[in-house]
Amino acid sequence: MRIILLSGGSGKNLWPLSNGTRSKQFLRLLTAPDGGKESMLQRIVRQVEEAGLNVPITVATSQTQRDIVVNQLGNKVEVVTEPERRNTFPAIVLAASYLFFEKVCDPEESIVVMPCDSYTELSYYDCIKRMVKAIEANEAELMLMGIRPFDFSTDFGYIKTENSGGDFFRAVC
């Protein structure tokens, strides 16, 4: 199993603290276990380690944010840089291509793709472990984690599901 963290957004949601160069995921606003401050990116990597997911992490980011990622995480992760921002899907394709062609990963290896600016509890990673086990047991080829919406917004996509009798739901096509 490998993890791709998506960290290429412009992150203007916390303007003026964040901007096109310094996105919200790099701001050290969260309290770390040692009482110091950590960024969302640092928190996600720490939580992955605390959850026992001792797997390689690749961060997909923009060229302008590469140095910030390296500064905050050092050699804990590998960094893949997009020549220019092209949104989520191209970032995933670039990182997956890097893993396949440069790192020569097994094409059957599970890859977890997640944003680096999530604020989650450790139980989130238990769910990821269960999802990977389901993939490895050939229960599915692709899995997507989502939440039930409280109301609807045109900002998000929605998936119609049906209960498959287990921990997971199947998408209705």
Report each predicted region and the residues it spans.
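N-terminal glycine-rich phosphate-binding loop and ensuing alpha1 helix
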Residues: 1-69, 75-77, 81-86, 98, ...
